[in-house]
Curated annotation (Swiss-Prot):
The keyword DNA repair applies. ATP binds at G30, D31, N32, G33, S34, G35, K36, T37. NCBIfam families: recf (TIGR00611). It is found in: Cytoplasm. Pfam families: SMC_N (PF02463). The gene is recF. Gene3D superfamilies: P-loop containing nucleotide triphosphate hydrolases (3.40.50.300), RecF/RecN/SMC, N-terminal domain (1.20.1050.90). GO terms for biological process: DNA replication; DNA synthesis involved in DNA repair; double-strand break repair; SOS response. The lineage of its organism: Bacteria, Pseudomonadati, Pseudomonadota, Gammaproteobacteria, Pseudomonadales. One of its GO terms (cellular component) is cytoplasm. Belongs to the RecF family. This is DNA replication and repair protein RecF.
């Protein structure tokens, strides 16, 4: 799975551009502020209908433009080309088109174009709140387990109903009990999917991490969000008074976490910045391997400022792991010479120079393996 064409209009400082990227390695280089990251942001918009740089749309849409648009052609795993398009307006409205038809939700984009982002904010996967790690976990489950999304939607609906009742007390006891049962059933299914995914992820992550850095005492564990020895219905009943006082449900899969520890301590508090980056890269590369194994296509990787925080040895190791995935990768850097020895001679590599928002292809080397 790869993008064969990307057209971008009115995204930040970028001039209108149509790119024909390599199916493997694509390097965007140029000075800081030239627009390299904006190209990755445009691809991210195409795959997820949102920016990774801003929760607000206004900074993403070019000044004096009403909307930004990104179109792409994706070569699917079955060899069929799929056309994607998204237009986002300043007011927040968006239109998604897949093969000429309006799409109902961004989930359809995500399913068609699985994206993995590695950027300077990726440290938040280790340092940030549990919500970030849940999103990482659920992204992986979504892409390997087709039954996950409808169950997750059931869970969200039941959770909204229960939290509304906790705040306003407008449900009769029978309705309350019914929503608690629905919440418990959906939670058990979500927990089972997540647990199965972690069991598959751990050995792949450990093997991938060993290729990047020696951290033998680093462990990955899963907390499901409530006592592992108690049924969620029982926990909900026993915590009802406290939940009413807090105004929301305290236990359940919405409180799950992926715990990453080194010698029993929070890894984020011990690891250097470079080590943290390598751990995050290993996690995201491991997810790519699982998608490949599940025959659900391949990820497209967006790697912003790959050389930062890494010495030459670790840069080369990361390049080789990305190359061995056999998928499409978009990498930004200031100095492309730092990456020139990272690829095998037969790997297709396209180079794009970005200057003052203008993107131009400079070199294509290698041939498709």
């Amino acid at each position: 799975m790869s993008l064969t064409r990307v057209s971008v209009t009115a995204v930040r400082n970028l001039h209108p551009v149509t790119l024909s990227p390599s199916p493997r390695i694509n390097i965007l280089y140029g000075d800081n502020g030239s627009g390299k990251t904006s190209v990755l942001e445009a691809i991210h918009l195409l795959g997820l209908a949102r920016s990774f740089r801003s929760a607000r749309l206004q900074p993403v849409i070019q000044y004096e433009e009403a909307a930004c648009t990104v179109f792409g052609q994706v070569m699917l795993a079955n060899g069929i080309a799929s056309n994607l398009g998204i237009s986002r307006e300043r007011q927040g409205e968006f239109t998604i088109r897949i093969d000429g038809q309006n799409a109902r939700s961004a989930a359809q984009l995500a399913e068609t174009l699985p994206l993995q982002l590695i950027n300077p904010d990726s440290f938040r996967l280790l340092e940030g709140a549990p919500k970030i790690r849940r999103q990482f976990l659920d992204w992986g489950v979504f892409h390997v387990e087709p039954r996950f999304l409808p169950v997750w939607q059931r869970l969200q609906k039941a959770l909204r109903q229960r939290n509304s009742w906790l705040r306003h007390g407008k449900l009769d006891p029978a309705s309350q009990a019914a929503w608690d049962r629905e919440l418990s059933l959906a939670s058990d299914e979500i927990d089972a999917y997540r647990r199965s995914y972690i069991q598959a992820l751990k050995p792949v992550f450990e093997e991938t991490l060993a290729e990047l850095v020696s951290l033998d005492d680093l462990t990955l564990s899963y907390y499901r969000g409530w006592d592992k020895d108690r049924d969620l219905l029982e926990v909900l009943a026993s915590s009802l008074l406290r939940d009413q006082q807090m105004g929301h449900t305290q236990a359940g899969p919405q409180r799950a976490d992926l715990r990453i520890r080194l010698s029993g301590h929070n890894a984020a508090e011990i690891l250097s910045r470079g080590q943290q980056k390598l751990v995050v890269c290993a996690l995201r590369i491991a997810q790519g391997h699982l998608i490949n194994r599940a025959k659900r296509g391949q990820c497209v990787y967006l790697v912003d400022d790959l050389p930062s925080e890494l010495d030459e040895q670790h840069r080369m190791a990361l390049c080789r792991l990305l190359e061995d995935l056999g998928c499409q990768v978009f990498i930004t850097c200031v100095d492309p010479q730092l990456l020139k020895d990272g690829w095998r001679t037969d790997t297709p590599v396209s180079m794009f120079h970005v200057e003052h928002g203008k993107v131009s292809q400079t070199t294509t080397i290698g041939s498709e393996a």
